[in-house]
């Protein structure tokens, strides 16, 4: 459809009166429509309210709010940009005027649309003049002296940047598009950058220096793994050699255990009950324990937890009694060979008076894992302490748990199973040959070692705690106690 552009231009110009420029001025060149710049209004001062001024009272409350420093005689580009922004925010198209021609007053109109026209015939400032039709097309600046037309935020669809800030030295404008605005920040100043905030920007890759490289992966040399020497495969031994090797290792282990017990308990062999964790150096003490109610109560607890038959529990009791008898025989043999034994080294060898050390007797509490001085007052003080009362109950429960493990491990031993078969037949299972006796002794010692390891893992004594307990016990003795007695010659019975 053909259109008469000339008639359109003529009608648009005639519809607005009091224009400060005419079609003749615009015919010379595209930019001749802009008059010379005048920094001062050449009109005479008009008293009262200016009829051609915008309807806003800039001296009212909004003036103080926006910080305006201009009086009412000068038109403010910030207010015009706000009016233009409000016109678009009300749902109207940016290409259609936000007013009806019937409401237009001669010589005045609010600038509300992107293509709307204002009549500023009485204003001589060229930056206040509106652009002609099509002058604010896509990618074109609105005004010659300002890349953003003094209303820079209009190009981005946002609020104006403020009054009195659009007349300075303007930076170069970037590339702007209507539907997708792309801003190149390299050539924009501070004011333009602030105007472009909130606009979708190009996602540039992060800057990396020229010599910057990412984390290098650790590379292994191809021949590194080949240089590692592979251990030769172990030679397969026959069953007899393997059994012999295990026997020698077990005997060496038992020998070290005997030396450890000798250093711990002395040359005297201790009598022990594996179920009750009872230890005594006196034959009478172990005999009384095996016939006591405490030992019988422990056997009943084992039977209740393991569901063993009565013959099994009787056999386990006989095993403990047989162990006691073997210990007695070993002690007699050691006494016979006492003459051939080397003399024991003196414990106090190398101790000088300056070392302030002395040999004393102590009482060991297995429940608390502490050593108490062999004094009546110290022992009684420890018995009445709250720690001992609590540790005593805990230690008793621990013994009950370990007794079940001990009974189960004894019955799982192949040698003990063979003896149990003989015991059920009515034979004496403990009459063995010397070789079997040696093997049995090694197995019993190994069993005791396992039991002690379990006990140590659950409750390991601390030397520091022991010394602290001893110091506390000595410091807490009553004031009336006589400390003049010699601990080495004391006759207090513990």
UniProtKB/Swiss-Prot annotation:
Annotated zinc fingers (C2H2 AKAP95-type), start-end: 273-295, 365-388
GO function term, MF aspect, one: zinc ion binding
One Gene Ontology term from the biological process aspect of the record: RNA splicing
Subcellular location: Nucleus
Source organism, top-level taxon: Eukaryota
Chain segments carrying region Disordered: 1-22, 147-170, 202-264, 429-494
Compositional bias of kind Acidic residues: 433-451
Extent of motif Bipartite nuclear localization signal: 200-221
A single cellular component GO annotation: DBIRD complex
Predominant cellular place of this UniProt entry's protein: nucleus
Composition skew (Polar residues), residue ranges: 7-22
Pfam families to which the protein is assigned, alphabetical: AKAP95 (PF04988)
Keyword entries, A-Z: DNA-binding, Metal-binding, mRNA processing, mRNA splicing, Nucleus, Repeat, Zinc, Zinc-finger
Subunit structure: Component of the DBIRD complex.
Function in brief: Core component of the DBIRD complex, a multiprotein complex that acts at the interface between core mRNP particles and RNA polymerase II (RNAPII) and integrates transcript elongation with the regulation of alternative splicing.
Similarity comment text for this entry: Belongs to the AKAP95 family.
Name used for this protein in its record: DBIRD complex subunit ZNF326
Protein's organism: Xenopus laevis (African clawed frog)
């Amino acid at each position: 459809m053909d259109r008469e552009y000339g008639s359109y231009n003529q009608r648009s110009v005639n519809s607005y009166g009091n224009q400060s420029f005419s079609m003749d001025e615009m015919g010379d060149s595209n930019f001749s429509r802009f008059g010379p710049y005048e920094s001062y209004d050449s009109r005479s001062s008009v008293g009262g309210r200016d009829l051609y001024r915008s309807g806003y009272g800039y001296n009212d409350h909004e003036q103080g709010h926006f910080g305006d420093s201009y009086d009412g005689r000068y038109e403010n580009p910030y207010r015009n940009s706000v009016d233009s922004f409000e016109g678009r925010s009300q749902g109207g198209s940016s290409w259609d005027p936000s007013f009806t021609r019937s409401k237009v007053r001669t010589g005045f109109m609010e600038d509300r649309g992107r293509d709307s026209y204002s009549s500023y015939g009485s204003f001589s400032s060229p930056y206040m003049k509106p652009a002609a039709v099509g002058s604010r097309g896509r990618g074109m600046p609105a005004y010659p002296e300002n890349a953003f037309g003094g209303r820079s935020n209009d190009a981005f669809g946002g609020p104006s940047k403020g009054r009195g800030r659009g007349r300075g030295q303007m930076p170069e404008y970037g590339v702007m598009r209507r539907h997708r605005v792309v801003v190149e920040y390299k050539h924009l100043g501070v004011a333009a950058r602030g105007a472009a905030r909130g606009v979708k920007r190009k996602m540039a890759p992060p800057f990396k220096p020229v010599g910057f490289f990412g984390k290098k992966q650790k590379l292994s040399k191809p021949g590194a793994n080949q240089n590692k020497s592979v251990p030769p495969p172990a030679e397969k031994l026959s069953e007899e050699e393997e059994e012999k090797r295990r026997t020698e290792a077990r005997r060496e282990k038992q020998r070290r255990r005997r030396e450890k017990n000798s250093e711990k308990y002395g040359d005297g062999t201790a009598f022990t009950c594996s179920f009750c964790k009872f230890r005594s150096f006196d034959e009478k003490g172990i005999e009384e324990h095996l016939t006591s109610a405490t030992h019988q109560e422990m056997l009943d607890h084992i039977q209740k937890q393991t569901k063993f038959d009565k013959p099994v529990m009787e056999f386990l009791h006989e095993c403990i009694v047989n162990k006691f008898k073997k210990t007695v025989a070993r002690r007699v043999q050691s006494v016979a060979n006492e003459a051939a034994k080397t003399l024991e080294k003196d414990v106090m060898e190398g101790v000088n008076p300056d070392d302030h050390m002395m040999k004393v007797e102590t009482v060991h509490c297995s429940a608390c894992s502490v050593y108490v001085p062999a004094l009546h007052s110290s022992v009684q003080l420890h018995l009445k302490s709250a720690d001992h009362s609590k540790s005593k109950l805990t230690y008793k429960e621990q013994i009950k748990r370990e007794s079940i493990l001990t009974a189960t491990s004894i019955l799982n031993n192949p040698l003990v199973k063979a003896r149990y078969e003989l015991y059920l037949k009515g034979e004496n299972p403990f009459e063995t040959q010397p070789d079997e006796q040696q093997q049995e002794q090694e197995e019993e010692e190994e069993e005791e070692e396992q039991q002690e390891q379990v006990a140590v893992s659950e409750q390991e004594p601390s030397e520091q705690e022991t010394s602290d307990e001893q110091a506390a016990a000595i410091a807490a003795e009553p004031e009336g106690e006589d400390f003049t007695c010699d601990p080495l010659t004391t006759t207090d019975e513990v």
